[in-house]
Amino acid sequence: MCDGWWGRWYQPYPQYIVQRLDIQNVIERLEEYISRLGRFKISEVMEFTNNFYAIIIEEDTGMGAFELLVDPYSGVITPEPGPNMMWNLKYGMHNRMHNVWVPWWQVGPNSEMPISSEEAKEIAYSYLKSIYPTEDIEVEEPAKFYGYYTLDYELNGRIHGMLSVNGFTGEVWYHSWHREFIQEKELS
């Protein structure tokens, strides 16, 4: 049973039936998974109450390749919804059809985008300030992917969540599916 359209997209497992995975176990599962895909490595893993989140980068370029979610109880690994699927010009679902927001003849899957990482950070800050006008907001350095940036942010000194900024349009996509931050581990 799911929690609805915007809720958890996987089967919730009550804690009394299945024990929650720890971050090290999730890292091992992710390493095994990406070893079958080829030239990728894990950049970071974050643990939230609803899932584990991982940034996967290309070994040869260091560029963000894609984002994955891991169910904290079953260990099922899935592509993260949102920008990872819709804006990712190289590994997303539009990589064969080209990006739907930009004419195909104007862009290919390279690392160049009209919006810089600093501009993406400013766009993210402005967006968050409109939602949390009285909070102390700090936006961390963005992770760069093919077509967009993903940024973690803090409210009042604590990691609160993340959002993505399209590198061509400046559109913001808030990651509402993670819930409360627990911990993170940087790997590269």
Residues of each region from the PLM?
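Long, terminal "pre-/pro-" and other extracytoplasmic accessory regions
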Residues: 1-188
